[in-house]
Amino acid sequence: MSKTYIPEGEKAPESQIGATLDALYATIEQRRNAGDESYTHRLLTGKLDDPLKKVMEEAGEVALAAKDGEPDHLRYEAADVVYHLMVVLARFGIGIDEFAAELNNRMRDDERPEGAVRLYETYVNRGK
């Protein structure tokens, strides 16, 4: 049985993950100016260590959930990692398309989706 659904009357986007990440990134950017009552605002404008620690903390929780063999908990913690990672990317001005381009650059031509955005070679940094 599937654990996912699309509400009646709504049409699924071509890519769920793309539409979801786009919406999440837009929300993160909107919260940049939301004020201190917003957790996301505080992560974007406060001490750099705060969102970095959250990425590391949540990544550890992903590992523990996977080790425990708990798929529902793993999915939950993975979403936390993605959210906090996207906050860090936004803090450094790395947009979702630029991040997608980095992922696409790591694929062979025959693996990459048609029309996929890529980074210009001058921006490719292989961990140097």
Task: Name these PLM-found stretches.
Residues 1-78, 82-128:
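Flexible "arm" and connector segments at domain edges
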